[in-house]
């Protein structure tokens, strides 16, 4: 006991001593921990609230009130498989260079972005379907539920407008605000007002009164604008990269970041409870979206921004004025050498077997227990708490187990949980409370046993960027999604399997059919079986190919530090006027 008291006293002594200035070897003073708590807590809460609004089956507003056909979402996603590559190329080039491009390159970017923005506006204001032959127009009118020839062009217009204008706007914002706000904070500041405004429009506009074909494209336009003004997740990125010190970074993400979930948990409790008390439909009632959601958006945004300005970004990087310009092919060559990105992409491809699966918490709470009020709130909080002990112990667990071991263990747990889900639906599916209790226990235990992995994954993503710098001279974070070019089309096609099988089981766009035991049981067993197959296959790449150990990372960091020291010794050499320019053919920084 005396020993434990001594540790507590030593901790509080350190807090007082290093309140404003961190100890040697560390970077984050304890005072900043409070700011991280508030900023990340507000950000997590906003992400929770944003989760209620999505152009997909998981959105109550879209599913219950707009009744968009299930296959409409999949059809729209397939429209843009090819064009997504163009936007990926452009955005990766901008992100990798932080928006600071040579003048000639910048003019080309602006020409492409603004051309598509103008084309999108024309498609939205004029009926392009009038130029189609009657046969083609008739085919478009009858091919997809909820989409006709007019709506087809409007959907493309919304897509082109938001991607074109969003790309142009992104370059301008970076050039104006990046030096002042940092690479992660700038979009949180510049998007919040527009993002919340569009969210309120989605909640308030009476689009459900429109014909289905008009309703679909107007909803799609609103959600494209909503995505263009994304304002969440940026604060988390600051916290994930808060310190070059590995253990300090893990500590920050295990304690102040994890404890900040308290803010979200309060909203998790209040929102469904108030909705259940005020509105007949509870959390899924339309008035919840009209009145409660906007109010919680505003309060959460205020909480985040009060603390956000007090957090510092500590990413080792040269001054913007001295930053090299890296061409597309230089970045591609560097990314293709990173074997760990390939392994993660292979795992993601295998994980797509479960794409289209219904949310287990929704099925458990609404369609099995049939709760939307107080019990819904309490159950959600308990399930979210399941991962807390593991995440608080993450630094201790990560010290003692390699990342490979944690990944394999996690997939074993997920596979076991899927087996329990199948047993619950197969044998207890019509006994609602017994089935729900078994689902609840399996969900809780699964999250509890795998929770430490979430923090370990965030840390590993940073280590993979360290490895990228080790092999190519730059982190190329904006290009790390390029391997998705190869896996993305396959993922989209695989994602059609479960929705098509749901249709054969009797579930299309009417979610009320999930209250029917036979339909719900059949749909859940189908989806979980695909999930189970994915979890088993996801173990294999880590077992046979992953060799990024902690010891290897230590050696990489030593080499990176040695390179930084050598470059530091060269800073006194005569320099020409700094300008953004093409790198040497090797792709190395100078």
Map each language-model feature to its residues:
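Intrinsically disordered, low-complexity cytosolic terminal tails
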Residues: 572-590
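Membrane-embedded alpha-helical bundles of multi-pass transporters/translocases
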Residues: 4-573
């Amino acid at each position: 006991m005396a020993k434990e008291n001594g540790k507590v006293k030593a901790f509080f002594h350190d807090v007082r001593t290093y309140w404003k200035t961190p100890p040697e070897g560390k970077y984050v003073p304890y005072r900043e921990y409070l700011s991280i708590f508030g900023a990340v807590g507000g950000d997590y809460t906003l992400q929770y609230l944003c989760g209620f609004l999505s152009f997909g089956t998981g959105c109550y507003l879209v599913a219950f009130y707009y009744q968009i056909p299930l296959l409409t979402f999949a059809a729209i996603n397939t429209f843009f498989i090819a064009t997504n590559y163009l936007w990926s190329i452009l955005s990766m080039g901008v992100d990798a260079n932080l928006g600071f491009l040579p003048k000639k390159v910048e003019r080309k970017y602006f020409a492409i972005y603004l051309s598509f923005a103008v084309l999108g506006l024309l498609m939205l204001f004029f009926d392009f379907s009038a130029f189609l032959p009657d046969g083609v127009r008739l085919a478009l009118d009858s091919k997809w539920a909820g989409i006709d020839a007019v709506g087809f062009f409007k959907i493309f217009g919304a897509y082109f407008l938001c991607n074109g204008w969003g790309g142009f706007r992104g370059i301008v914002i970076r050039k104006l605000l990046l030096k002042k706000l940092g690479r992660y904070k700038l979009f949180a500041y510049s998007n919040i007002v527009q993002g919340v405004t569009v969210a309120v429009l989605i909640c308030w506009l009476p689009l459900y009164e429109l014909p289905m074909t008009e309703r679909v494209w107007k909803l799609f336009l609103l959600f494209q604008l909503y995505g263009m003004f994304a304002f969440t997740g940026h604060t988390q990125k600051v916290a994930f990269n808060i310190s070059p010190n590995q253990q300090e970074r893990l500590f920050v993400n295990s304690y102040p970041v994890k404890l900040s979930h308290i803010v979200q948990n309060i909203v998790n409790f209040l929102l469904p409870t108030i909705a259940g008390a005020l509105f007949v439909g509870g959390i899924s009632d339309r008035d919840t979206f009209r009145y409660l959601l906007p109010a919680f958006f505003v309060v959460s945004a205020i909480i985040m921004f009060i603390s956000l300005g007090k957090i510092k970004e500590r990413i080792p990087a040269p001054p913007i004025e001295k930053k090299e310009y890296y061409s597309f092919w230089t970045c591609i060559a560097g990314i293709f050498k990173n074997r760990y990105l390939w392994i993660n992409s292979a795992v993601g491809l295998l994980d797509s077997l479960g794409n289209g699966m219904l949310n287990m918490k929704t099925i458990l709470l609404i369609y099995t227990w049939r709760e939307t009020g107080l019990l819904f709130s309490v159950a959600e909080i308990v399930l979210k708490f399941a991962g807390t002990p593991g995440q608080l112990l993450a630094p201790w667990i990560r010290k003692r187990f390699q990342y490979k071991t944690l990944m394999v263990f996690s997939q074993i747990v997920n596979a076991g949980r899927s087996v329990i889900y199948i047993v619950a639906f197969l044998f207890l599916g019509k006994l609602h409370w017994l089935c729900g209790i078994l689902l609840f226990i399996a969900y809780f235990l699964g999250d509890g046993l795998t929770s430490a992995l979430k923090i370990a994954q965030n840390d590993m993503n940073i280590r993979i960027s360290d490895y990228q710098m080790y092999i190519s001279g730059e982190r190329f974070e904006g290009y790390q999604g390029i391997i998705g070019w190869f896996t993305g089309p396959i993922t989209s096609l695989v994602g059609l399997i479960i929705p098509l099988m749901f249709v054969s089981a009797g579930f299309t766009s009417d979610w009320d059919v999930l209250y029917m035991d036979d339909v719900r049981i059949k749909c859940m067993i189908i989806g979980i079986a695909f999930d189970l197959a994915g979890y088993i296959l996801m173990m294999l790449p880590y077992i046979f190919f992953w060799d990024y150990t902690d010891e290897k990372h230590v050696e990489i960091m030593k080499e990176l530090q040695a390179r930084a020291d050598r470059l530091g010794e060269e800073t006194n050499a005569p320099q020409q006027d700094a300008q953004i320019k093409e790198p040497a053919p090797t792709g190395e920084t100078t």
